[in-house]
Amino acid sequence: MTQTPIRLLIAASGTGGHLFPALAVAEQLLDYKIEWLGVPNRLEQTLVPQDYPLHTIAVEGFQTGFSLKSVKILLGLFSSVFQVRKLLRERKIDIVFTTGGYIASPAILAARLEGIPVILHESNYLPGKVTRFFSRWCQTVALGFEGSSQYFPNVETVWVSTPVRAQFLTPQPLDLPLEEDAFLIVVVGGSQGAVAVNQLVRQCALKWLEKGAYIVHLTGDRDPEADSFKHPHYFSLPFYENMAGLLQRANLAISRAGAGTLTELAITQTPAILIPYPYAAEDHQTYNGKVFADAGAAYLYSQKDLTPQLLEKVVLDLLNSPAKLQEMAEKTGKLAVADSAKRLADLVRNHTLLAEVSQK
């Protein structure tokens, strides 16, 4: 007799920081029947494999204070909860896993109303408002940073770090024309790019290139000046699919401080100069970056304080300090949790079993 597979709904949407950890967990649950909940016209439309049926609902972030827009958003939430409840029933979902963000609220509420267990993963050190508010209706909140438990005094939490995709765990070939022993600087602004960081780097790049460095600059697709700087050893790309191979080869990264990117830096033991996105909700990227800076794994600078002159000097100093870079790489590696995806998948499996037992 063939056993019916467990049916899992993954609610993850918007940015790589929400999607990549969810995809990593899905890779660990090959025996589950997985379906995906997202938002129309977002990154999940291209990243989520066709093996996972993608369902979309319209949902917006909450507004503080009372206004017509906040009333509209609240009514939209009620509508989206109704849609998700219908989906949970029709698809006979057994358990829900979400990585937070706007999509988490209707997913958690609908699952709660249907008596379906929910596992919520929060990758940032400072949990988002949605996570903090809706965590009370989840079976467990899995944490990307160990210190984040302080924000959940009345909720069961477990530290698992943040999962990375499987390719980060094995050596990956790189198809870029780089000299074998050349110093490689990788500039990455996250899945949405970072125009301000791009401008800073272009003002400094020539000095670094003159010292023999190569630069791979991932600009994102929203930078109108992306092609304004040219040099044989400078590669400007909107995105690069093989991030695992790129960071494994990198000697230094200049990056935002999103939780997903930091996890990839830790797994690949890549020293970094971190420039938190200044408009991130509640400045959460600064909290993330501070963990790495305090551990000696990265330098942390606010965007408003980082001048081209300072960035140029810091990188040149590191170019001339291989011992310092090695020390930073080792400290970065100590922050890595290679089996994070398995830990989260095991959490999903355990709560699936608990739910089955409670129903008998």
UniProtKB/Swiss-Prot annotation:
Residues that bind UDP-N-acetyl-alpha-D-glucosamine: T15, G16, G17, N124, R165, S191, Q285
A Pfam family hit: Glyco_transf_28
Entry's localization field: Cell inner membrane
Pathway linked to the protein: Cell wall biogenesis; peptidoglycan biosynthesis
EC primary class: transferase
One Gene Ontology biological process: cell wall organization
HAMAP family (UniProt xref): MurG
Annotated protein name in UniProt: UDP-N-acetylglucosamine--N-acetylmuramyl-(pentapeptide) pyrophosphoryl-undecaprenol N-acetylglucosamine transferase
Protein EC: 2.4.1.227
SUPFAM superfamilies per UniProt: UDP-Glycosyltransferase/glycogen phosphorylase (SSF53756)
UniProt KW keywords: Cell cycle, Cell division, Cell inner membrane, Cell membrane, Cell shape, Cell wall biogenesis/degradation, Glycosyltransferase, Membrane, Peptidoglycan synthesis, Transferase
Catalysed reaction equations from the record: di-trans,octa-cis-undecaprenyl diphospho-N-acetyl-alpha-D-muramoyl-L-alanyl-D-glutamyl-meso-2,6-diaminopimeloyl-D-alanyl-D-alanine + UDP-N-acetyl-alpha-D-glucosamine = di-trans,octa-cis-undecaprenyl diphospho-[N-acetyl-alpha-D-glucosaminyl-(1->4)]-N-acetyl-alpha-D-muramoyl-L-alanyl-D-glutamyl-meso-2,6-diaminopimeloyl-D-alanyl-D-alanine + UDP + H(+)
Gene behind the chain: murG
Membrane topology: Peripheral membrane protein
CDD domains on file: GT28_MurG
Family to which the UniProt record says this protein belongs: Belongs to the glycosyltransferase 28 family. MurG subfamily.
Keyword presence, Lipid biosynthesis: no
